[in-house]
Regions:
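An anion/phosphate-binding loop that grips the pyrophosphate of nucleotide cofactors and donors
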Residues: 39, 226
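Acidic/glycine-enriched edge-of-secondary-structure segments
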Residues: 5-23, 44, 193-209
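PLD/PLD-like phosphodiesterase catalytic module centered on the HKD motif
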Residues: 1-33, 55-132, 136-148, 152-178, ...
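N-terminal carbohydrate-binding/catalytic regions of secreted carbohydrate-active enzymes
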Residues: 32-35, 41-56
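Beta-propeller domains
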Residues: 206-222, 228-250
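Aspartyl protease catalytic domain
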Residues: 155-157, 161-217
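Structural alpha-helical scaffold elements that stabilize or flank donor/cofactor-binding regions
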Residues: 35-36, 222
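Glycine-rich anion-binding loop/nest that anchors nucleotide
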Residues: 47, 232-234, 325
Length: 372
């Protein structure tokens, strides 16, 4: 019997992997509802898109149980389109409607971020001790149709950082702080690394001017020192990331593999595939059919039936895992995002098994990536 690769647990860290196409099913819908039901005193929920009935019902139970201890913030619309035309994670605007339908509107705050940027987080903080995060939205698509990974982490220190970030998004000036960092300003610093058992976890956030490009800078630095890279990404279009990948991994001998979403890659590519103004040679990997594969996903539909390859995942040197809400695109730098950089051979092995399942499935039954 093949080993069950859908769930990994080590001490206070639990990882739930999901892909219906690759037959990896950790039942994240149930685990998310159980996480919410486990709240005894307080629950903070920051979510880009919420439509899943089981999750909404669990939040309704939490409202009855916790009263003022429940607070939800959600993305309330993208606002005007950005001049670049580059977007991320399209969605129908139903979250607010459903929150009201389930009687949760008095516990919820709509977040409007100016300039077409997104409140793109997907995390919960429970009782100041536990964090739920990952790549998946709380939707039918995010929990049952897409490729996603979710984490439940017990750590008071990590919970404090996420709670502070949550409160920052409620600040009246939050929506207007998403602008490029002053180049003369001090470089952003990551939050302190926390240990969960033997796993070192460093959280990164993009929540405004003080942390602008914090996550991107850390990811590029990690790639610059890596010799082996595995990427599972909805899209791959950040200039800094693309440049280091071209410089260090475009050689046929380089140890790199990737799983991407063909439809969403068009959002970040230059003509004829897309409308980006980035140099075509940065997308060398879309022609590398041996090392990069595309998921047989479909383009966005207004209903909650989107089946994107939705991970935002990198595994480096069998030691480091990068995952969270942060797409590897330029747009992510000015969204509200969170990502984790974890150092642990055991965690990296679990994520590699998941990656390999996706890669093998899409190598056989995938969809070609767009080329330029």
């Amino acid at each position: 019997m093949a080993p069950n690769i859908s769930i990994f647990q080590a001490g206070g860290l639990r990882v739930y992997f999901y892909s219906h196409r690759a037959n990896v099913n950790s039942n994240p819908t149930k685990h998310l509802a159980d996480f919410i039901d486990g709240a005894k005193k307080a629950l903070l929920c920051a979510i880009y898109d919420i439509q899943d009935q089981s999750t909404l019902q669990a939040l309704k139970r939490a409202a009855t149980r916790l009263s003022t201890g429940l607070h939800i913030i959600y993305d309330a619309g993208k606002g005007p389109a950005r001049k670049t035309g580059v977007t991320a994670d399209p969605k129908p605007s139903k979250s607010g409607q459903l929150i009201k339908q389930y009687g949760l509107d008095s516990y919820a705050t709509a977040v409007h971020v100016q300039g077409g940027n997104l409140m793109h987080d997907k995390f919960l903080v429970r009782d100041a001790v536990d964090v739920w995060t990952g790549s998946g939205n709380f939707t039918k698509g995010g929990l049952t149709l897409q490729d996603n990974n979710f984490l439940a982490i017990t750590s008071a220190a990590l919970s404090q950082v996420y709670a502070d970030t949550f409160r920052g998004m409620l600040h009246p000036a939050h929506g207007s702080t998403h602008s490029p960092k002053n180049p003369k300003g001090a470089p952003p610093k990551p939050h302190a690394t926390v240990k969960v058992g033997a796993v070192k976890i460093t959280p990164y956030f993009t929540t405004g001017v003080n942390e602008f490009e914090d996550a991107e800078t850390a990811i590029v630095k990690a790639l610059q020192g890596a010799k082996k890279v595995r990427i599972a990404a909805m899209n791959l279009g950040d200039p800094g990331i693309l440049q280091v990948l071209k410089q260090r991994f475009s050689s046929p001998q380089a140890d790199i593999r990737g799983v991407l979403d063909p439809g969403q890659m068009r959002q970040v590519m230059p003509p004829p595939a897309g409308r980006s103004k980035q140099p075509a040679d940065l997308f060398w990997f879309t022609k590398d059919h041996n090392r990069f594969v595309g998921a047989p996903s479909h383009t966005f539909v207004p209903s909650d039936n989107n089946d994107f390859m939705h991970n935002k995942l990198m595994i480096l040197d069998d030691q480091i895992v990068i995952t969270g809400s942060y797409n590897f695109s330029e747009h992510a730098e000015v969204n509200d995002e969170n990502t984790l950089i974890m150092q642990s051979p055991a965690v990296a092995k679990a994520y590699t098994q998941y990656f390999d399942a996706l890669f093998e499935q899409y190598k056989k039954n995938g969809k070609p990536l767009p080329i330029v």
